């Protein structure tokens, strides 16, 4: 007979840290250059006009303007920035 009680080790009991992925700025929102639009794994969304992509596939605004989402079918879903036209007053 054993003199010590058998101690089992659990294979569960751990969890990864949250990654906070997803859309950060939605369609129609005004953004500043550098604002993060989407954090994603892979290219669920692709970069359209005035949008850059980081090395972890994060999409960010390159210009000030309004966020626009477009679905181009087989080509995928694109996010672009519609730059606001600034009118110059004539003196």
Swiss-Prot record:
InterPro entries: Ribosomal_bL27, Ribosomal_bL27_CS. Coiled coil: none annotated. The keyword Ribonucleoprotein applies. One of its GO terms (molecular function) is structural constituent of ribosome. One of its GO terms (cellular component) is cytosolic large ribosomal subunit. It holds the Pfam family Ribosomal_L27. HAMAP family: Ribosomal_bL27 (MF_00539). Belongs to the bacterial ribosomal protein bL27 family. NCBIfam families: L27. This is Large ribosomal subunit protein bL27. The gene is rpmA.
